[in-house]
Amino acid sequence: MTTAIIGTGNIGGQVARHLVAGGEPVVLAARDESHATALANELGPLASAAPVRQAIAEAEVVVLAVWLDTSKQLIVENGDLLHHKVIVDPSNPIQLDGKGGFSRTLPDEQSAASVIAGLLPADAPLVKAFGTLGAEALASSANRRPRRAVLFYATDDEAAAATVERLITTAGFDAVKAGGLSDATRIEVAGDLHQYGGMNGNVVDADEARVAVALAA
């Protein structure tokens, strides 16, 4: 199985590094193709770079590691290639506020995942994942010992869940399901299961994560 990672910034780059370290082949794409090529060269033979449409076509899983508005544009432009792909959305509905912080771009009750899901083909299952930690923690917490760090995910599709659980494990984390896509706000920024929300900056292990999921279930 090949995973396409669209976007090679703070999140996409770290996801690519962790997957390759775990032996997973990836194909990278970025708005500036030189960035994808440079990262692929850094990561070695399990990584390649391609234009966006080629990367999507070559992969079974597509990670949209870009800002929400860019994800929306990518889906509109490449929807014909997304049929039967597992789509992974790590985005958060935020924007820079010009004061060193962030502000939400959606109403509090609306998730980025719900926006993405509404644009995807019906046969392209969506999994909210790889966005529950900040970039620094995502980079430093893979294969943590003695207790592995958790990445939460949410989806309505059991087959897609199994696929993404395997990728999370390969990347060096434990996977804990937060619920279906209706629960995605819990694992986006300011949600009770996000590092920069109810987790108060902490990176939890599997036991702590399951307790946290159950508290608001």
What are these regions (language model features)?
Residues 44-47, 51-86, 90-100:
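Rossmann-like NAD(P)-binding element
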Residues 91-142:
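Rossmann-fold NAD(P)-binding glycine/threonine-rich loop
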Residues 1-45:
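NAD(P)+-binding Rossmann beta1-loop-alpha1 motif at the extreme N-terminus of oxidoreductases
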Residues 34, 42, 111, 118-126, ...:
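Internal alpha-helical scaffold of NAD(P)-dependent oxidoreductase catalytic cores
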